[in-house]
Structures are given as C-alpha cells and as structure tokens.
C-alpha cells in the first residue's frame, strides 16, 4: 500500500494570506442551532448503526443517514417558564441495510434511540416526550453477507462510491479560533453549570475589518431559568464576559462584542425560549447547511458543499475526503517549517480505491524567506502517508476522535 505512486500535486499558492486580507468573515452555528441539530442526529445515527453492524457482523454495512430534516415547532416562551404549543418534528431518512441473510436488523429502533440519546445531550431543556416528534423513514436494503466479505477481501481498500472532492486548510486564523472557541466554551459543561439559563442554540459571527474584530453572538436563553428582565440581562452580561475572556486570550486586536442585538427591552422583546433552541419557534434545519468538518463556515477559504454528517464512513468520499483533507492540512501546517497557509483538495473517481484519488492537490503559501522547493517533499510525504493509511479515518470516526460539524 505504501509503495503506490499517487497523484499528489504540491504547488505554491499565490494569494494574500487570510490574516493579511482587509476583511474576514467567520461563522459557527452552535450545537443547538437547527442545522447543527440535523447534522448531529444524522451523524449519531450513522455511528450507532456502524457500531451495531460491527458488533453483529464484524463489518460496517452500507448506509447513509445524511437526510435529516428539522421542522420548526411553535412555542410561547415567557419569563419564569412558557410552553411548547406545537412540537418540533424531526424526520430521519436515507438508506440502511435492514435484512442480512434473511435476518432482520433493527434500523429504525437503533436510529430512534441514537437520535433521542443525542438530543438529551445536545439540548438539555428539550422534553423528548412533549417538545419533539421523531419519525424514522430510513429506506430499507438487504445484503448477502458472504458477498460482502468476499468483496471486502477482494478490495481491502474501499472503492469510492461517488466522484466528489473534499477540502481542508490550516492553520486557523485568529478570528477563526475566537469564533470556534467562543461557541464551544459557551456550550461547555463548565459554563452551563454556572449559567444554566444559556441554551444551546448559540450562533457566533466574526468580522475582522483591518485590525478590528466584531463578534456578534446570538444565544437563546431558557425562560424557566430567568424570572424577569433583570435576570435575563445578568445572563447576557455573563455571556459577554465569557466571550471577552476568550477574545483576550487569543488576540490583542481591538474587539467589539455584541450579544442578542435584536433585543428591544422597551418593547418587551428578549431572546427567550422554552427549550434553548430556535427550532421551537419555526426555525427549520437541514444536514449540510451549517458548519464544515472543522466546525466553521469560512467564506474567505476554499470550502466543499458536501454534507459530511450521516454519510457512511467506509466508502463515502463526501465524508472521508473532507476529514482527510483537514487532517493532512493540519499536519503539514504543524510539522513543516515555513508554511504560512496550506490548502488541500482531494478528488475521487467513482469505483476507484479511495487511497488512490484522481488528484490530491496541496497548495502552500510559504512564509517570508521560504521557497516552495523546500516545502514540497515533506508536504508530499505527509499527504502520501495519510492516503496510505486512509482506513484509519473509519476507526477515528467510530471512536469519536473526529467531528464533522
């Protein structure tokens, strides 16, 4: 496997590094955002099915559960505690093998349990009995296990199920780190213990204009945890101070932090929710409409439009190549001296082994004083090593060592 000659192209990228561009935009949709809920459920279902397939049959059977729709409900929030009038509707769809050698495999049971388990962790104030309806319409499939094993023996490296590409880059910019870590901290167990009123639907938008950063945070506040507007304003202040701490640990640039800017106290308008997610109030969510595999939405960077969440971790290059591109880029940025920025794009060809992409493009912006000539060989070797060991990604996914949104 290591002896293969792969089509890896390492070249210099001539463009202004993101940190030197005048305007940079960065977004993260928090785990309670409707789009992130869809991503999280889709991925939780895929991982649960994969683990159960391995447990029963020793191999991950074919499935894709990347079609999850969150249909917003209707709620009446009020200080001290409101109510959900119309529950959120969540549709699980896609495909999964349900018959194995005439033996029934409980796809829907596993999928529903995985979805509920995920929601319990992701949206703490969501009452699964009254606030949400989960409907599994995952399509059925059947398989001859002997045929599956014979195919796996013949092709130890899975064959790409699509002609598609993945994209990754490194390192993160200052603004990207701030946006990512602000949401992660506000949704951390540590912060929630101190401020249980802060819901999980937290969206962070970063704008850097020159050397000044604007950080806009929209955070759903749980109505049962705040009795009045004064309580609400105290929680907003806590969010502001927490974000300020993150910002100050990452940059010396002047930064403006804004929290829940749509509030209008004079009109009695506050961002309060019953559940901690705007999905209760008609906001819908879909897989792939939110964060990329590095957890961010970054219009200043190359991005793939593929939805990674819910795709099978064996042969679906829409998932595997996006993760792989990110890992290769991270290693090149960390291990190769003289790299200012690196962008990785990997293209598959349907039916070909996933360790032999049609092309693996590595584009490097060298640091001042460094030539691309001295960066090409180590960058090539890192990309080649990851491709030679591409099946490790499947294991990393099942062990929850990589995220996809």
UniProtKB/Swiss-Prot annotation:
InterPro entries: AdoMet_synthase_2_family, AdoMet_synthase_3, S-AdoMet_synthetase_arc. Its EC number is 2.5.1.6. Pathway: Amino-acid biosynthesis; S-adenosyl-L-methionine biosynthesis; S-adenosyl-L-methionine from L-methionine: step 1/1. ATP binds at residues 139-144. One of its GO terms (molecular function) is magnesium ion binding. The keyword Phosphoprotein does not apply. GO terms for biological process: one-carbon metabolic process; S-adenosylmethionine biosynthetic process. It holds the Pfam family AdoMet_Synthase. This is S-adenosylmethionine synthase. The keyword Magnesium applies. Keywords: ATP-binding, Magnesium, Nucleotide-binding, One-carbon metabolism, Transferase. It comes from the Archaea. It catalyses: L-methionine + ATP + H2O = S-adenosyl-L-methionine + phosphate + diphosphate. The gene is mat. Catalyzes the formation of S-adenosylmethionine from methionine and ATP. Belongs to the AdoMet synthase 2 family. Its cofactor is Mg(2+). It comes from Thermococcus kodakarensis (strain ATCC BAA-918 / JCM 12380 / KOD1).
């Amino acid at each position: 496997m290591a002896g293969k000659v792969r089509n890896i192209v390492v070249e210099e990228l001539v463009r202004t590094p993101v940190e030197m561009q005048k305007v940079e935009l960065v977004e993260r949709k928090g785990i309670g955002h409707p789009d992130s809920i869809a991503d999280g459920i889709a991925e939780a279902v895929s991982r649960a099915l994969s683990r159960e397939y391995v447990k029963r049959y020793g191999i991950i059977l074919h499935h894709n559960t990347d079609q999850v729709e969150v249909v917003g409900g209707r709620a009446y929030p009020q200080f001290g505690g409101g109510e959900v009038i119309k529950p959120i509707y969540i549709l699980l769809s896609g495909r999964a093998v349900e018959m194995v050698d005439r033996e029934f495999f409980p796809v829907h049971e596993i999928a529903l349990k995985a979805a509920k388990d995920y929601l319990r962790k992701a949206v703490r104030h969501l009452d699964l009995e009254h606030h949400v309806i989960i409907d599994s319409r995952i399509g059925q499939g059947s398989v001859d296990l002997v045929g599956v094993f014979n195919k796996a023996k013949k092709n130890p490296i899975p064959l790409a199920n699509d002609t598609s590409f993945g994209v990754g880059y490194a390192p993160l910019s200052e603004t990207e780190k701030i946006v990512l870590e602000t949401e992660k901290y506000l949704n951390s167990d540590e912060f929630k213990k101190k401020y249980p009123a802060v819901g999980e639907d937290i969206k962070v938008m970063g704008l850097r204009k020159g050397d000044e950063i604007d950080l806009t945070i929209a955070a759903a506040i749980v109505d049962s945890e705040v009795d009045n507007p004064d309580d609400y304003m105290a929680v907003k202040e806590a969010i502001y101070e927490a974000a300020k701490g993150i910002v100050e640990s990452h940059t010396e640039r002047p930064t403006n932090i804004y929290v829940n800017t749509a509030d209008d106290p004079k009109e009695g308008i506050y961002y309060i929710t019953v559940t901690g997610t705007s999905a209760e109030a008609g906001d819908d969510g879909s897989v792939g409409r939110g964060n990329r595999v590095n957890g961010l939405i970054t219009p200043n960077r190359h991005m793939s439009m593929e939805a990674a969440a819910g795709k099978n971790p064996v042969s679906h290059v829409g998932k595997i190549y996006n993760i792989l591109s990110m890992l290769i880029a991270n290693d090149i940025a960390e291990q190769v001296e003289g790299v200012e920025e690196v962008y990785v794009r990997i293209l598959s060809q349907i039916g070909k082994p996933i360790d032999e992409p049609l092309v693996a493009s590595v584009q490097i912006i060298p640091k001042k004083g460094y030539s691309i000539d001295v960066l090409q060989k180590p960058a090539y070797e890192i990309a080649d090593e990851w491709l030679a060991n591409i099946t490790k990604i499947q294991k990393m996914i099942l062990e929850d060592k990589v995220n996809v949104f």
